[in-house]
Amino acid sequence: MFSPRTDVSRPITDRVKESLFSVLYKYDLPDGKIVADLFCGVGSLGLEALSRGAEFVTFVEKDPKTVAILEKNIEKAGFASESKVIRADAFKIGAAVDEQKYDLIFVDPPYSTTRETKEGSPLSELLVLLSEQSAVDGIIVVRTERRTELLSRYSCLETIERRQWGTMAVTILQRSSK
């Protein structure tokens, strides 16, 4: 996989990625599901989902240089027809593509934007938006620093699980039908 020549990115290790997808399997994900990968960088999580049987992945990344690398990675992996790349700020659009509802959404913003989680914060506003863009029972996976604690609920999203690996944490939220 191609990656940017910068120290700004926070690539997820293969061990953590394997552990995360083991957790997702118990929710019958990602096989056959519609997925979004927000703040995707070079596409590691979305490409992993495709390699594990996801039907389609929408990648959202705002940095033009990173998008160019992402597109190379998608092409190299052979998933061009099963994916779409949107160059935009995910805080502004979420995962929006028409009226698509997503079964699984990865949210991996810069840690500096996730330190504030209370109502009205950028992360909170994004999660409320994603609650409208996810399918009923859809899963949203949010990567943050280990010390960041998300609220137990954002709109109709409820925190159902939290895992920690090293200095990072992953919080899994699920959309209820309410």
Describe each PLM feature range.
Residues 1-178:
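Class I S-adenosyl-L-methionine-dependent methyltransferase catalytic core
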